[in-house]
């Protein structure tokens, strides 16, 4: 699992198959939520923020964040609904992913193998590629550079690597 805030607007836009304009609107929405101290834990949190910004009460806030149109916000909401209908909502929430979960060993010092099953990849390739990118980015930012070691602490294999480069 990952919190929506941790996943970020760029990877979420990829998972939602948004175009550049819609991705930029999502970035503005994330920035507004951050400026208001709102933590986006799951998709309903993001939906609530977008719904507020497109409501009568939030129209001034919406105008103040760079002119996100109601139509663009509507596209993002529909994309969220589609992602949820494909089971994508199960990925977002708390507690968030912790890199340490992948770097565990048993009492004798042998590594523990962790598997991430994603089921039918063909039904949600954009989400799968975004999740893999999220995991790689999180590992890159949280693991220290150690140079050449006798044994690696982590070995990361993933199938369907071509998904990372589609629309790159």
What are these regions (language model features)?
Residues 1-168:
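P-loop NTPase motor domains
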